[in-house]
Amino acid sequence: MIIYEYSNKGCRVENQDYISHGSLPDDGYVCILTDGMGGYSAGDEAAKTVAESIRAYIQNNYTQTNIPNIINEAITYSNDELMLKRLSIGAQRMGCVLALLVVTKEYAYIDWLGDSRVYMFRNGKEVYRTEDHSMINEM
């Protein structure tokens, strides 16, 4: 599998995007994109902590029997790791948004939190786009 990465900080002073990816058994693959939350402390560290802990959890616990459950457990684990990181550096609040993809021979599984989107294209046309988790969308 060939992976390309691109990140653009836009009008921000600091780029708090982080991408982590790796191989899984049976030609599977995991890819996570995180972006530190503006207005919170150490967004870059939050993004890295969450992405790396999700990737490691999925790689260490991967089975093809219940991938959605493994993804949920990985997100919970990453939140625990983020809280430990927050305490270790003395930050008041840390957070990030995330988008993730797990690919197997048969399926692609996605999950996301916040306003980072996942798009699916078929024959050059957008056929699916995740909906942002935001206060406006919840109203």
What spans do the regions from the language model cover?
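PP2C/PPM-type serine/threonine phosphatase catalytic domain
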Residues: 1-139
